[in-house]
């Protein structure tokens, strides 16, 4: 089926329903494109790094507006496109359409929410059922999740990943060797990349999330040295100020969902890496609710645990 990407873009931005067969075609085309990308995608500067989106479509549109737009800016998205917010489908499809339209300008990395198990609990599955009356569209999207890269490397100097490091992974080549085209395992290197968090710890420690590890400055310094990189850019954790540098600037957390869960009151940020590797942060706030569109509260059918907050 031939799809008109520009027409779909307009429909997504206006919040119109996307037919199931159109979603299927988009997902099939996206899989075909993504399967040829490396586990660690290569990206050139200048580039803008974006953190979690979590279905906040109107804030995603603001992100593009504030950072130049995909027509003239290169982007790396660090995962967690879905769940929590009420426009997970539209947010993910918007990014897929941009990926298909401008394949060299958008790099999409898998987050811990881009899995079947997590989306069943945290909103995406229920959203699709509410909008379509069946789970087909959810299944199509989950198949695309399996093809997303696990990381990116910018100018051989900045390693991008959703969560963090793993005791099972020392080098980027070990990440490149992973068979990524699967549901995220409950443990091991692939799991840790999507689930781990930096913390003030002396060595690898158990994560309170129940998956991944906590890692400290020593682990970051070692990874930077062994792989000859200067920075780890990751997302995965809410930062009230939008971004947070740690470990003498060797790691940064970027968070791009303002007023997360429509109640946290945080600002969001994106990080632009210039050709000389200079870092420039852009801060933005949530879209205000207007005419029932934007940062509005919509009741969900099922109570959701808050352990990601």
Swiss-Prot record:
Cofactor(s) recorded in Swiss-Prot or TrEMBL: Mn(2+)
EC number: 3.1.3.16
Assigned keywords, A-Z: Cytoplasm, Hydrolase, Manganese, Metal-binding, Methylation, Nucleus, Protein phosphatase
Binding-site list for Mn(2+) 2: 80, 112, 162, 236
Single annotated GO MF: metal ion binding
Subcellular location per the Swiss-Prot or TrEMBL entry: Cytoplasm; Nucleus
Leucine methyl ester PTM positions: 309
Catalysed reactions listed for this entry: O-phospho-L-seryl-[protein] + H2O = L-seryl-[protein] + phosphate; O-phospho-L-threonyl-[protein] + H2O = L-threonyl-[protein] + phosphate
Record PROSITE patterns: SER_THR_PHOSPHATASE
Keyword Glycoprotein: no
UniProt main location, coarse: cytoplasm
Ligand binding (Mn(2+) 1): 52, 54, 80
InterPro entries xrefs: Calcineurin-like_PHP_ApaH, Metallo-depent_PP-like, PPA2-like, Ser/Thr-sp_prot-phosphatase
Cofactor binding note: Binds 2 manganese ions per subunit.
Catalytic center residues: 113
GO biological process, one term: positive regulation of double-strand break repair via nonhomologous end joining
GO cellular component: cytoplasm; nuclear periphery; protein phosphatase 4 complex
Assembly description: Catalytic subunit of the histone H2A phosphatase complex (HTP-C) containing PPH3, PSY2 and PSY4.
Function: Forms the histone H2A phosphatase complex in association with the regulatory subunits PSY2 and PSY4, which dephosphorylates H2AS128ph (gamma-H2A) that has been displaced from sites of DNA lesions in the double-stranded DNA break repair process. Dephosphorylation is necessary for efficient recovery from the DNA damage checkpoint.
Protein family according to the UniProt entry: Belongs to the PPP phosphatase family. PP-4 (PP-X) subfamily.
Full protein name: Serine/threonine-protein phosphatase 4 catalytic subunit
Gene expressing this chain: PPH3
